[in-house]
């Protein structure tokens, strides 16, 4: 039985936000968790990334927020700053119409800035364990008004040595509160947390959705970041797709890609979460009607799209997680038709390739990045195919006299070559500039150096000149990363 978000009878503010985000049908984890969350039940959810668990806990969490209150009403504890940022962005979108204030807090960010933000009375805090505990110990954040706690990816926090921090944080929350705990696995220490801090929790277990992709040809191209765009345009020239979707990881990427493709002579439109629903619908209508060749999209903007006839999907940026890859390529190969999906992998993203292959239970074939000569040959072949189609239509009587006159002065090969040259779209080398995106790594590799039984996220307050080595390391990494972006 299909459950839609209308079935949850949410407030008008949340209904508006969910509609804007493109949600229609609830995923299994959402269908089971949201009613329990709204009923104020404690929940243990076993679910992988990509199953929609952020909305599963985020919707009931935001629904219970009182926007008129100046107090912190909910905290979400996440293992990494990347996840904390991602979750806070999702919660902001869900709570936008309700005016729910969301604040992400994590190590590596200036603590003075965080303290100033905390004074602006956020309703929801999303943070990493060590930095949350740091603020508790500094007394810059008080949790006596918290009524909902979410532990996201609890097993990952256990692996990173955060279990003591989590227990300390939960000890500062009122006894009467709701806890939603999400974990892919349930090792003994996580079970102990559930026993100690949860009341008669309901268990929800959902496996990550596996999708059959037998009718989709899947390829990967190993290509450096700076060569991605030329590789994309050459593929478009060679393959000449009827309808193509290009996926970018960020809104900035989508905007820049759309502009660059149009500069190179392709007709492209971009869609992402910052565009109004009306603008997104206009772009989609043009795409369905064939008025544009390429639709450039983020994962969130493309969620729930139902477009028939998509022949090619280009993953310009590798997706955030393997399940998003499955959803992306599922835009093609529909209704029994075959489709083609190509994923650009930078040399430092090979671990993501393996993770995707494990999820789809299928190896991708390697495709060599095409050369400029191959792109020109591809466009010539498109022209030849068009000429053959026109010949087969046998509607050429009006042009026969002019053709005969040409053949009196030139041989047939020269005449045909001139026609092919005239009709062929020459590759456009107009310079374009895209902001480089940092390579995406699997969580296992991102956290490889941080796994131990010790706290890794800053611990408690040790005085203003005595930051933890982890925070110093994170700050150093931030500086290096910032430098690489600006170079």
From Swiss-Prot:
The listed location of motif Q motif is 3-31
Q: How does it assemble?
A: Oligomerizes, may be a member of the RNA degradosome.
Q: Which catalysed reactions does the entry list for this protein?
A: ATP + H2O = ADP + phosphate + H(+)
**UniProt GO molecular function:** ATP binding; ATP hydrolysis activity; RNA binding; RNA helicase activity; RNA strand annealing activity
- Protein's UniProt name: DEAD-box ATP-dependent RNA helicase CshA
- UniProt motif (DEAD box) ranges: 152-155
Q: In what ranges is there compositional bias, type Basic residues?
A: 441-454
What role does it play?
DEAD-box RNA helicase possibly involved in RNA degradation. Unwinds dsRNA in both 5'- and 3'-directions, has RNA-dependent ATPase activity.
**Principal subcellular localization:** cytoplasm
InterPro entries, sorted: DEAD/DEAH_box_helicase_dom (IPR011545), DEAD_box_RNA_helicases (IPR050547), DEAD_helicase_CshA (IPR030880), Helicase_ATP-bd (IPR014001), Helicase_C-like (IPR001650), P-loop_NTPase (IPR027417), RNA-helicase_DEAD-box_CS (IPR000629), RNA_helicase_DEAD_Q_motif (IPR014014)
Q: Write out the entry's keywords from A to Z.
A: ATP-binding, Cytoplasm, Helicase, Hydrolase, Nucleotide-binding, RNA-binding, Stress response
The listed locations are: Cytoplasm
EC number(s) reported in the record: 3.6.4.13
**Residues where ATP binds:** 47-54
Q: Which residues form the Helicase ATP-binding domain?
A: 34-204
- Positions of the UniProt region annotated as Disordered: 428-487
To which species is this protein native?
Bacillus licheniformis (strain ATCC 14580 / DSM 13 / JCM 2505 / CCUG 7422 / NBRC 12200 / NCIMB 9375 / NCTC 10341 / NRRL NRS-1264 / Gibson 46)
């Amino acid at each position: 039985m299909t459950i839609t978000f209308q079935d949850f009878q949410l407030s008008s503010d949340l209904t508006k936000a969910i509609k804007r985000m493109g949600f229609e049908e609830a995923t299994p984890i959402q269908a089971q968790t949201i009613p329990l969350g709204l009923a104020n039940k404690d929940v243990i959810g076993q679910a992988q990334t990509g199953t929609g668990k952020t909305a599963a806990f985020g919707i009931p969490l935001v629904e219970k927020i009182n926007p008129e209150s100046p107090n912190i009403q909910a905290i979400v504890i996440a293992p990494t700053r990347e996840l904390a940022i991602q979750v806070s962005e999702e919660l902001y979108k869900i709570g936008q119409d309700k005016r729910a204030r969301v604040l992400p807090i994590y190590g590596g960010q200036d603590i003075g800035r965080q303290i100033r933000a905390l004074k602006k009375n956020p309703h929801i805090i999303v943070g990493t364990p060590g930095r949350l505990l740091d603020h508790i110990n500094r007394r810059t954040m008080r949790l006596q008004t918290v009524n909902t706690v979410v532990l996201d990816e609890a097993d990952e926090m256990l692996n990173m040595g955060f279990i003591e921090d989590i227990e300390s944080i939960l000890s500062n929350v009122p006894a009467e509160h709701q806890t939603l705990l999400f974990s892919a696995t349930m090792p003994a220490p996580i079970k102990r947390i559930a026993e100690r801090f949860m009341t008669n929790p309901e268990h929800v277990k959902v496996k990550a959705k596996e999708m059959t992709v037998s009718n989709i040809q899947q390829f990967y191209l190993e290509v450096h970041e700076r060569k991605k765009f030329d590789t994309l345009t050459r593929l478009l020239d060679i393959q000449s797709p009827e309808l193509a979707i290009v996926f970018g990881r960020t809104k900035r990427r989508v905007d820049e890609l759309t502009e660059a493709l149009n500069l190179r002579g392709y007709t492209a439109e971009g869609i992402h979460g910052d565009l109004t629903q009306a603008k997104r619908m206009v772009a989609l209508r043009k795409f369905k009607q064939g008025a544009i060749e390429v639709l450039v999209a983020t994962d969130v903007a493309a969620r729930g799209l139902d477009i028939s006839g998509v022949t090619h999907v280009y993953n310009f940026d590798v997706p955030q997680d393997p399940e998003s890859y499955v959803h992306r390529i599922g835009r093609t190969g529909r209704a029994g038709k075959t489709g083609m999906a190509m994923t650009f992998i930078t040399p430092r993203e090979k671990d993501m390739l393996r993770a995707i292959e494990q999820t789809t239970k299928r190896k991708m074939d390697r495709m060599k990045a095409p050369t400029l000569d191959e792109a020109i040959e591809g466009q010539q072949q498109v022209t030849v195919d068009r000429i053959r189609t026109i010949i087969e239509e046998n509607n050429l009587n009006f042009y026969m006299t002019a053709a005969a006159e040409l053949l009196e002065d030139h041989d047939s090969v020269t005449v045909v070559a001139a026609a092919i040259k005239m009709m062929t779209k020459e590759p456009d080398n107009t310079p374009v500039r895209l902001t480089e995106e940092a390579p995406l790594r699997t969580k296992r590799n991102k956290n490889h150096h941080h796994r131990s039984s010790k706290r890794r996220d800053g611990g408690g307050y040790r005085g203003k000149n005595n930051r933890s080595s982890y925070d110093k390391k994170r700050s150093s990494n931030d500086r290096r990363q910032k430098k690489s972006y600006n170079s």
